[in-house]
Amino acid sequence: SLLDEATAAAEAVGLCQRLDKTETNKIFISNSCNPQTIDLIKTRTEPFGLELLVGNEKEYLSKIEDNLICGVLAYPGTLGEVEDPSETISQIHKKNGKVILISDLLSLAKLKTPAELGADIAVGSSQRFGIPMGYGGPHAAFFATKEEFKRSMPGRIIGVSVDRHGKKAYRLSLQTREQHIRRDKATSNICTAQALLAIISAAYAIYH
């Protein structure tokens, strides 16, 4: 888990930048994303010289001739509109970009999943699963990606292992990505997560 939806989206952009082989500096973000998410991505990308292209995917995306690092889409949009993003995802992939789908967990009980739609990364807030609004937080975010990208993920990853008694044990995995080993070359500076809230959301989902 990560701190909130906007932070998770910005970390996803960072993952895409690490994986990019085209040397482009352009990122597309749909204007149907939450305004706070757009602003936070702007704040995180500007110091790295990245160009953020914000617009309507149906009209604006086709006008972009260059390669993209990634495209950030909302599913559903911030106003609740539900549209099939498959064509947009295909367009971004044709421009050699990864696709980040900001998703609503509860809606995914009925809608196609990001994986089924062809997205590379799925992020969002787990607040809908049993967490009070709390005047804006705290809310845990979720972050999921393809197996092939796991070594570029931000934050800490908990893996399942076996202890010396042969019982299942949970431990930190892939720690060579983190600050205490890679220092300035770490995949992220995220040092914490909303673990308690993530557990509450998981328990809520299991119960229901």
Q: What are the residue ranges of the model-derived segments?
A:
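Active-site C-terminal subdomain of aminotransferase-like
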Residues: F129-H208
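Conserved PLP-enzyme active-site core in the AAT-like
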Residues: T7-L19, E23-H165
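N-terminal export/assembly segments and adjacent metallocofactor-ligating motifs
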Residues: S1-L3
